[in-house]
Amino acid sequence: MIIPVRCFTCGKPLGHLYAVFKQRVLAGEHPGKVLDDLGLVRYCCRRTLMAHVEWIDDVLIYEKR
């Protein structure tokens, strides 16, 4: 739900890269190339960004009022 700030496995900071990654992928670039350009070579870091799903908008409709 919340963007990953650090890689869950190795602890590398990723929060500052997520907005760039998302913007470039939505623009049509291949995710693998974007991750290469961002300098993410470890598969654990790549997995953390690629597997993230933003569910916050879906969850907010169930907010207790």
From Swiss-Prot:
One cellular component term from this protein's GO annotations in UniProt: cytoplasm
EC category: transferase
UniProt catalytic activity: RNA(n) + a ribonucleoside 5'-triphosphate = RNA(n+1) + diphosphate
Cofactor(s) of this protein: Zn(2+)
E.C. designation(s): 2.7.7.6
Cofactor notes: Binds 1 zinc ion.
One function term, GO molecular function aspect: zinc ion binding
Residues reported in the UniProt entry to bind Zn(2+): C7, C10, C44, C45
One record GO biological process: DNA-templated transcription
PROSITE patterns in the record: RNA_POL_N_8KD
Location of this chain's protein in the cell: Cytoplasm
UniProt keyword list: Cytoplasm, DNA-directed RNA polymerase, Metal-binding, Nucleotidyltransferase, Transcription, Transferase, Zinc
Main location: cytoplasm
Keyword RNA-binding found: no
Annotated signal sequence range: none
Pfam families: RNA_pol_N (PF01194)
Subunit structure, as described in the record: Part of the RNA polymerase complex.
Family according to the record: Belongs to the archaeal Rpo10/eukaryotic RPB10 RNA polymerase subunit family.
Cited function: DNA-dependent RNA polymerase (RNAP) catalyzes the transcription of DNA into RNA using the four ribonucleoside triphosphates as substrates.
Listed name of the protein: DNA-directed RNA polymerase subunit Rpo10
Organism of provenance: Pyrobaculum arsenaticum (strain DSM 13514 / JCM 11321 / PZ6)
